[in-house]
């Protein structure tokens, strides 16, 4: 079992993004997916919300973790949060995550090489 929760502190944000091998973006939100028994990081997402839509910067598993279903749930939880803010458009950079996962979560390729949802 795992738990997905928003990161609450800058210290935890740096820990999560560093563990995932991604840069920590100023002002971005981060969700961490952790094992419920031992708190081990399983994956994370980093995103932003603006008036013109949300942006998914990263949807990454932790090194050595290969659990497509868990990553799918993390991706959908991230998009659900963005949607609940009233922002119904979301973009993702072409390198935001594995293409198969981004498509499964609901993104489709856009003309600029990234993805739209």
Language-model features, listed with the residues they occupy:
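Short amphipathic alpha-helix that is part of the acyltransferase structural core
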Residues: 1-26
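Short glycine-aromatic motifs
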Residues: 2, 28, 106-109
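Conserved donor-binding loop and adjoining core beta-sheet/short helix segment
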Residues: 31-69
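Conserved acetyl-CoA-binding loop-helix of GNAT-fold acetyltransferases
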Residues: 66-80
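Non-catalytic positions within long, well-ordered alpha-helices that form the structural scaffold/packing
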Residues: 80-83, 103
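Conserved GNAT acetyl-CoA-binding A-motif
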Residues: 82-95
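Conserved active-site alpha-helix within GNAT-family acetyltransferase domains
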Residues: 95-112
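Minor-groove-contacting beta-hairpin "wing" of winged helix-turn-helix DNA-binding domains
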Residues: 114-117
